Curated annotation (Swiss-Prot):
Classification via CDD domains: TIM_phosphate_binding
SUPFAM superfamilies, per the entry: Ribulose-phoshate binding barrel
Protein name: Uncharacterized protein TK2179
NCBIfam families per UniProt: thylakoid_BtpA
The organism of origin for this protein: Thermococcus kodakarensis (strain ATCC BAA-918 / JCM 12380 / KOD1) (Pyrococcus kodakaraensis (strain KOD1))
Family: Belongs to the BtpA family.
Protein origin, superkingdom: Archaea
Length: 261
């Protein structure tokens, strides 16, 4: 992925998958909705898409086998349908499953919520999986990149942000770092984002809260943007991706790229 152009990465938030509490028994409709969103993102001009088991609340720390298999099927369908770079995130913190799926479907990157350190979450205490993931990458070598959160959203963190950031990169071996607001759709703290950019030897990606209104300000400090909530119909995360809203954000990004040349 070309971080020189500050890519827009659009979220494909999946409906509840088999193996999750809210699954309604209709897997075909899950796949169809995911493909519609992925195609819309490609048509709008997004630079990449990322698929995530967003609907699987309440999340376990690690996904069960049914969920992993189902997510792989959806990811492969998206891989076959669109030509954009593809990412995988398995909530709440199953980077091993995410990498395995990405390897199987030839995806390009994964997101890991807690690669290093400890997060206090609604799933309990989640510990980093950097060692386990590094060993899997060694066994299954590929070009798949690891995007790792620092002080991930929907969690409480007691350590220093700068220390956690550097640990994630230097000891966790993240290929890029993700900085988010406190929750899905909530904007990132610009001061924290600026600090991340100042100290980071790897790309810094905004992981939540990017909108048409704040993109110009965030553009100064970020190398990429994971966008979900704002590009949905009416700006509501549970809705489908809106072609109009997604195109509007893409056009703004084009203007910002041009102005920075």
């Amino acid at each position: 992925m070309d971080f020189e152009r500050k890519p827009l990465i659009g979220m494909v938030h999946l409906k509840p998958l088999p193996g999750s509490y809210l699954y309604n028994g209709d897997f075909d409709s899950v796949i169809e909705a995911a493909l519609r969103d992925a195609v819309t993102l490609e048509e709008a001009g997004f630079d990449a898409v990322m698929v995530e088991n967003f609907g699987d609340v309440p999340f376990p720390k690690y996904a069960d086998k049914t969920t992993v298999a189902s997510l792989a099927v959806v990811a492969k369908a998206i891989r076959d349908e669109v030509s954009l770079p593809l990412g995988v995130n398995v909530l709440r913190n199953d980077g091993i499953a995410a990498y395995s799926i990405a390897y199987a479907v030839k995806a390009d990157f994964i997101r890991v919520n807690v690669l290093s350190g400890v997060a206090y979450t609604d799933q309990g205490i989640i510990e980093g999986i950097a060692h386990e993931l590094a060993m899997l990458r060694k066994r299954l070598p590929s070009e798949i990149k690891v995007f790792a959160d620092v002080h991930v959203k929907h969690a409480v963190h007691f350590g220093d942000f700068e220390d956690a950031f550097l640990d994630t990169v230097e000891r966790g071996l993240a290929d890029a770092v993700v900085v988010s607001g406190k929750a899905t759709g909530r904007p990132v703290d610009v001061d924290k984002l600026a600090l991340a950019k100042e100290i980071s030897p790897v790309p810094v990606i905004v992981g939540s809260g990017t909108s048409y209104d704040n993109l110009p300000e965030l553009w100064k400090y970020a190398d990429g943007f994971i966008v979900g909530t704002w590009i949905k119909r009416d700006g509501r995360v549970e809705n489908e991706v809106s072609l109009e809203r997604a195109r509007k954000l893409v056009e703004l990004a084009k203007e910002l790229r041009q102005s920075s040349i």
